[in-house]
């Protein structure tokens, strides 16, 4: 929120926040709501990297709904930061998604035997390069669209309708 305040005070009227970690979404959304209430002319977007577009979302979720270190994430890391990938562990690391019928959200250590949910064994550097290119292309399109967007209706934040 403080960064958003600074961005607004610097004269910017649009802020695009790209979230790349699933548990950061809730506090980022709270910051968006506070910024919107405080700065009427400030437009803030929180964009989750795994849901930038339909094709990006399909790649992230194809092997698990509650994924963690799965095919998509492992492929991305193989492409952009290969030194952080322990390739010798990949073939043995697949772990099923155990959250299908859960009512509550559980931490990874209660849903995975090894910190993985999904199939990192399917990962490759080539898939990661393709996915990263899609993410850049699709996010760029969102930002270009957002740079032109105006509110659908002209009401001030605190104005009653």
Where are these regions (language model features)?
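Extended, histidine- and acidic-residue-enriched regions that form the cofactor-binding/catalytic faces
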Residues: 1-15, 20-161
